[in-house]
Amino acid sequence: MNAKIKYRAALVGCSRMGAFIDNESSDPALSPYSHAAGYTKCERTDLVACSDIRTDVMKIAGDTYNIQEKNQYIDYKKMILEIKPDIVSVATQPEQRAEAVIFAANNGAKAIYAEKAMSASQDECYEMADACIKNNVAFNLGTNRRYDSGFNSMANFIKKGNLGKLKTLVAYCTGSLFNMGSHNFDLLLKLNNESKVTSVTADLTEFIWDSKSKELKADPTGQGVIEFENEVKAYAFNISKATKWDAICENGVVSAIDNGGHFIVRAKNKKYLLDFEKTSSTLNLIYDLVASIDNSKSYLGGIEVSVKSTEIIFGFIQSHLTRSKVRFPFTPLDIKLNRDFKPRTPRYNR
């Protein structure tokens, strides 16, 4: 395929991560950060349309990213059918994510960039995967650390065995499961070379559960243990407000601190430096999707790894509800996230 071809992108959800999170960061290494900014920066994509049920938010996003008014839609389904985009970004909340992803996959999208968490229920997650696989649609989840050059350098360093065999992984600030846990679980999978999960055990707090409807009314926070097929254990804690991670190997430790701003290798009698150029994880994710369309295969991401990290979220919830270890693969309980909250107004300016 001609490497100069440009893919046409359309955005579903024009709020914070969709279009305006760039205004919250002063770190140039993070830019572009939002979906819209990423497509605008990438020379292989054109952002041609957007959709949001809030017309005021959509108009400002359209003005910001030079999207013609006729290509701004309240109804995302109409947008996909009329615009026929190559790439669809779904930057909604998880409660609305599955319907939009499945519709895009079934109606001509070549690739989908979906925000995390992947879905509001485990069944929805599998339905999304089925639609993407059936239609040969490339899929990347917005777990940005997977596409971060620093964390990729860390993962490759561990994989090379410089410090011997990986034994233990620790995340110190797992956060709430759908918002931050989705990032953390995906990163733990990445650092452990995508090894299969064999079980999880979790204890959750801030757990608002409607037993009649079997719905979570808030994003739960908690901690737990993830066991892998290669005998590595990962501990997902909430014991620090600082976002940091340790990879404990036979002969040393690799640490990511300051949310991946710095990486430290501690090894007896040896000095190592993780050498990498800091680049935008959003832009890397989009380039990865473009390569997936070009060559009909997944690279850094894909639907399979997205499903694996989502299963950990629901495994944690199921472990808490049943007060037991959940062994993978498992039959999911009928659990769904269904919050009642008002959308926040994004920050339109720096």
Predicted regions and their residues:
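Stable alpha-helical structural segments in soluble proteins, enriched in small hydrophobic residues
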Residues: 28, 58, 281, 285, ...
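N-terminal Rossmann-like dinucleotide-binding module
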Residues: 1-65
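Beta-loop-alpha module in the N-terminal Rossmann-like domain of NAD(P)-dependent dehydrogenases
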Residues: 56-57, 65-132
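Rossmann-like dinucleotide-binding domain that binds NAD(P)(H)
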Residues: 51, 166-244, 304
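Hydrophobic residues in well-ordered beta-strands that form the structural core
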Residues: 11, 113-114, 139-141, 236, ...
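A contiguous active-site-proximal alpha/beta segment in oxidoreductase catalytic domains
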Residues: 87, 113, 118-182
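C-terminal helix-rich "cap/oligomerization" subdomain common to oxidoreductases
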Residues: 1-6, 11, 45, 51, ...
